[in-house]
Swiss-Prot record:
Pathway(s) where this gene product acts: Carbohydrate degradation; glycolysis; pyruvate from D-glyceraldehyde 3-phosphate: step 3/5
Organism of this sequence: Saccharolobus islandicus (strain M.14.25 / Kamchatka #1) (Sulfolobus islandicus)
Family: Belongs to the BPG-independent phosphoglycerate mutase family. A-PGAM subfamily.
Name of the protein: 2,3-bisphosphoglycerate-independent phosphoglycerate mutase
Keyword Membrane: no
This protein's encoding gene: apgM
Length: 414
């Protein structure tokens, strides 16, 4: 029996709701999708709950689920995955945080949570922080640059805990929060104290940085604080190949996703020009996926642009991103050959563009199979048509479904 290559494409934050600017259509409905439409003749579509109905997924928990790992078992927090994706090497006992370079005033009130989002000087600022803040109370501190405004911070030492609260207030106009212990333990209290000292030290370093002085002179907001959230102890994950028997690779520019994929043992590729944002190089991602499919059984392609547009409320940009993803799908199918490939296209969660945040809505999902199946008689691939399809699954079902239709699944039982 022929075993097929598997391509899983995730458009981050793909799912949406009717949008007033689109006369009640969703971005997926409004987008022109000729390549996807061409696959419908041999596809099943439907809806997926990344975690379970009504649960609002993070990109971390949803991807764990989609890769076949129950987040209720394996998820400890996002910080460790962000750090791994940003290039950190973690060991047992380390505590990692995800964070943003942000702008605050002298009273530590947040002016811009992302310091303008695009931060070309991020590497310089991380280097300066690492040179000037090496250790607090015998705990080593290390900063790692992520994409755009993002940064990861790793604490290494004895007697530290991830049971501490965020310093990120999550809204502008609010003061940077004081980290507090989330459990009654010496380790949590000590870690919170270290984080609060770190917050002040980071502000002192960045507020006097020559980099930020230049930014102010150029009319840009200074990146003069790091807002921390998502504390997580490092937890070792099983390798993807250990439970799927697949040689796997991933294409992504987003630190969180790269971190998860690397921890799963996938070969992670970030093509030149891939940014993890709206301005990513779609063609470079398509070419990378094509090359990886030559040597791997499973290739995961992650595109963040749809989610970035949604969080910023950019309706037209989300529609354009979907149309560019459609071209990516067409390019890959044309090069690899539709007879050699199982292709799944979905989102990791919904991010309605008028809400600007994740929601617990189910996400449309498409599964293309190159051999005769009972396909779904639908006219398009979108949230409304997906309700007519045969698939109604959870994220945890995805990996097993892909193994089954690629003729790679093993029988369960005698």
């Amino acid at each position: 029996m022929k075993q097929y290559k598997i391509l899983l494409i995730i458009a981050d934050g793909l799912g949406d709701r009717p949008v007033s600017k689109l006369n009640g259509l969703t971005p997926l409905e409004a987008a022109n999708k000729p390549a996807i439409s061409d696959l419908l003749k041999s596809s099943m579509i439907g809806l997926m709950d990344p975690i379970s109905p009504g649960v609002i997924p993070g990109s971390d928990t949803s991807h764990l689920s989609i890769f076949g790992l129950d987040p209720h078992v394996y998820y400890r927090g996002r910080g460790a995955f962000e750090a791994l994706g940003a290039g950190a090497t973690l060991k047992h006992g380390d505590v990692a945080f995800r964070g943003n370079f942000a702008t605050v005033n002298n009273d530590l009130v947040v002016v811009d949570r992302r310091a303008g989002r695009k931060l070309e000087e991020g590497e310089e600022l991380v280097k300066e922080l690492n040179e000037k803040i090496k250790e607090i109370n015998d705990v080593k501190i290390r900063f790692y640059k992520g994409t755009e405004h993002r940064v990861a911070v790793v604490l290494s030492g004895k007697g530290i805990s991830d049971k501490v609260s965020d310093t990120d207030p999550h809204y502008e106009g609010l003061k940077v929060l004081e980290s507090k212990p989330l459990e009654d333990s010496t380790e949590a209290l000590r870690t919170a104290e270290i984080i609060n000292i770190l917050t002040r030290k980071v502000f002192d370093v960045l507020n006097s940085s020559e980099v930020n002085k230049r930014r102010i002179e150029q009319g840009e907001k200074p990146a003069n604080i790091v807002l921390l959230r998502g504390a997580a102890h490092y937890v070792k994950l099983p390798s993807f190949s250990s439970y799927t028997k697949l040689k796997a690779a991933a294409v992504s520019a987003t630190a969180l996703i790269k971190g998860i994929c690397r921890e799963l043992g996938m070969n992670v590729v970030t093509p030149v020009g891939a940014t993890g944002g709206i301005d990513t190089n779609y063609n470079a991602k398509a070419k990378a996926a094509i090359e990886l499919l030559k040597e791997n059984d499973f290739v995961f392609l992650h595109i963040k642009a749809t989610d970035a547009a949604s969080h910023d409320g950019l309706v037209e940009e989300k529609v354009k991103a979907i149309e560019r993803i459609d071209k990516v799908i067409g390019t890959i199918v044309d090069n690899v050959g539709r007879d050699n490939l199982i292709l799944m296209f979905t989102g990791d969660h919904a991010t309605p563009v008028e809400v600007k945040e994740h929601s617990g809505d189910p996400v449309p999902i498409l599964l293309y199979v190159p051999y005769p199946i009972i396909n779904d008689n639908v006219k398009d691939f979108n949230e409304k048509e997906a309700r007519k399809g045969s698939l109604r699954i959870r994220g945890l079902d995805v990996t097993n479904i892909l193994l089954n239709y690629s003729n790679r699944a093993e029988k369960y039982g005698a």
